Regions:
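GH16 jelly-roll
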Residues: 1-203
Length: 203
């Protein structure tokens, strides 16, 4: 959304021998950094090409884009308070068209920044021109082995969100804006928000 978090890093990431991707918090000096995985980019986040007239960066070919279908992540959530993790979908040209059907909609399948203080996970999507805008909070329930699955079933009619196999929210048109354009996937972590700290400030 216009700028990248200054605490993103390419360090602290590895794949173990069981096909699990690990993202570890990395300390540099007096601050902490963490990584993210994304298969595309928002146009506004690309570094500006100084030779271009318009304030956009050089277009980057996405690694994976798709529209409609079932998207699922199996994960363990961060153990440190203040460490924000999310699984979401985004459109490269979000905000570029007055109708989100053509410009895209941010779809937050799972965000855990309320977990430490409120014991909740949130999901949802929204757009300022729709009747409904915002997120739905649902209780975080620990599993025996610590693994969780978060998912969304995205169709032309809307979105159905799942947590550990259970439906936690249904957001359907016309109350909810529905994207009809290809979007990319993000699995992200942030030690700090863009303009604020999530959870425990010590993290």
């Amino acid at each position: 959304w216009g700028k990248k978090s200054p605490t993103f890093t390419r360090e602290g990431v590895y794949v173990d021998g069981e096909s699990n991707l690990h993202m570890a918090m990395v300390k540099k000096g007096d601050d902490y950094f963490s990584a993210q995985l994304q298969t595309g980019a928002v146009v506004y986040d690309l570094p500006k090409d100084s030779k271009g007239f318009w304030p956009f960066g050089k277009f980057e070919n996405p690694k994976f884009m798709h529209k409609f279908g079932y998207y699922e992540c199996r994960c363990k959530l961060p153990k440190n308070n203040g460490w924000h993790a999310a699984f979401w979908l985004q459109a490269p040209g979000i905000g570029s068209h007055p109708d989100p059907k053509y410009g895209g909609v941010e779809v937050d399948i799972m965000e855990n920044y309320r977990q430490a203080k409120e014991g909740n996970i949130i999901c949802g999507c929204g757009w300022g021109g729709s009747e409904w805008f915002g997120h739905v909070a649902f209780p975080y329930v620990e599993t025996e082995d610590g693994w969780h699955t978060y998912a969304v079933d995205w169709s032309e009619e809307g979105y159905v969100f799942y947590a550990d196999g259970k439906v936690v929210s249904r957001q359907m048109a016309p109350k909810c804006a529905v994207s009809h354009v290809d979007e990319f996937i993000l699995l992200t972590t942030e030690c700090h928000g863009y303009n604020r700290i999530f959870g425990n400030e010590s993290a």
